Curated annotation (Swiss-Prot):
Transmembrane spans: none
The protein's name: F-box protein At4g05010
Organism, as annotated: Arabidopsis thaliana (Mouse-ear cress)
Residues covered by the F-box domain: 61-109
Taxonomic lineage from the root: Eukaryota, Viridiplantae, Streptophyta, Embryophyta, Tracheophyta
Region feature (Disordered): 38-57
Tree of life domain: Eukaryota
Pfam families per record: F-box
InterPro entries (alphabetical): F-box-like_dom_sf, F-box_dom, FBS1-like
Length: 164
């Protein structure tokens, strides 16, 4: 039987033989299932050759991954903190280098990308223009500092005036 667009149609065994197909008569392991096997000899009896895993990974690696780990860590030391999180997801070699860069470099140096104040650039420019200002820079939402007034000095002046 063969499936056509109209439905099933019976074909003779000669037509199957002409196509190079034949029925398997001995189907003990297959139960009632029928399979077709080509009578033509296959061109390649050997299974496809597997590529070694190191060859496939070498061809797929990027130029950044092919760098030596020490050089890769030095390159990653110049990347911002926020970008390191996305770089971890690239590959295993870059992930290892990111972890090493965090341990050795980012704990001690490289500042974060975002500035702590809204207009920090303007504040820094205004401070550089007027070098006479000795006031400390405070963030915009900092708690109010209580200023302690030395009241004893005021009382001493008043007492001197009163007891003259």
């Amino acid at each position: 039987m063969a499936y056509l667009s109209d439905g099933f149609e019976m074909k003779s065994t000669r037509e199957y033989e002409r196509l190079g197909l034949g029925f398997v008569r001995f189907t003990r392991g297959l139960g009632r299932k029928r399979i077709l096997i080509s009578k033509r000899a296959p061109e390649n009896d050997s299974p496809p050759v597997k590529r070694p895993s190191h060859e496939t990974t070498e061809s797929c690696r990027s130029l950044l991954e092919t760098l030596h780990q020490d050089i890769l860590i030095r390159v990653l030391c110049h990347v911002d903190h926020e970008d390191l999180a996305t770089l971890k997801r690239v590959s295993k070699t870059i992930r290892k280098a990111v972890i090493e860069a965090k341990k050795s470099h980012f704990d001690y140096s490289t500042p974060k990308k975002r500035l702590p104040f809204r207009d920090a650039i303007l504040i820094l420019d205004s401070n550089s223009n007027s070098s006479s200002q000795d006031d400390e820079m405070e963030p915009p939402n900092a708690p109010i500092r209580r200023r302690f007034i030395n009241r004893e000095s005021d009382l001493s002046k008043i007492s001197m005036v009163l007891f003259k």
